């Protein structure tokens, strides 16, 4: 039996939010929140979905550094964010399907931490569309989805972005018609700059 994609996505969202929150806050509150999201996900689906979602522990290596430009045309270097936990995701600047949902989860997860804990977390999105790389495009996407002042949406030249994709094993494919398919990945980087946890859901199609 096939279930609507919207229902499948809701289940994926719930599990992704759970994982991110538990990683960022190892408290009893976090465990309670984990239980809440898990129960909500169970209510959203009555059969297993076909898409895989998992959080995979990393080997703790230093996250590859990079310098890109944010939605305000300011240069951002990953290594300058040391001292705060980084939630790094790859977002297509033209995407209207899964990417907005990923952004919502990033925002909601951070908001639920409370002001003190949230001040120690930085949300970073790297443009997953090497054909739509202007600052205006990542700014417009951020405005459209209520994220303008909630994260840094980073972009650069196609060559710069391809270098980041390669460093983070992010698969990005552009068809002859311009359709972009990329891994919907989220990475947790600890305050010392080391990779801690990796999440991957279904591929995102713009």
Residue locations for each model-derived region?
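Hydrophobic beta-strand positions
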Residues: 67-68, 188
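Short, internal strand/loop/helix patches
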Residues: 124, 139-183
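N-terminal targeting signals for export/organelle localization
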Residues: 1-65
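Thiol-/selenol-based redox modules, centered on thioredoxin-like
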Residues: 175-206
């Amino acid at each position: 039996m096939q279930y609507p994609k919207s229902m499948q996505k809701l289940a994926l969202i719930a599990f992704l939010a759970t994982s991110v929150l538990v990683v960022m806050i190892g408290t009893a509150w976090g465990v309670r929140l984990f239980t809440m999201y898990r129960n909500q996900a169970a209510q959203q689906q009555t059969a297993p979905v076909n898409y895989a979602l998992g959080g995979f522990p990393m080997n703790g290596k230093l996250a590859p550094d990079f310098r890109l430009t944010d939605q305000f045309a300011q240069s951002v270097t990953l290594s300058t964010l040391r001292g705060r936990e980084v939630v790094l995701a790859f977002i297509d600047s033209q995407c209207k399907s899964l990417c907005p949902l990923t952004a919502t989860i990033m925002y909601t997860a951070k908001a639920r931490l409370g002001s003190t804990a949230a001040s120690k977390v930085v949300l970073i999105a790297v443009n997953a569309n090497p054909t739509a790389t202007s600052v205006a495009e990542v700014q417009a996407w951020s405005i459209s989805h209520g994220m303008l002042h909630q994260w840094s949406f980073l972009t650069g030249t196609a060559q710069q972005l391809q270098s980041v994709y390669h460093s983070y094993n992010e698969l990005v494919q552009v068809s002859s018609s311009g359709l972009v398919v990329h891994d919907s990945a989220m990475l947790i980087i600890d305050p010392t700059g080391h990779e801690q946890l990796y999440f991957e859901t279904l591929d995102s199609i713009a």
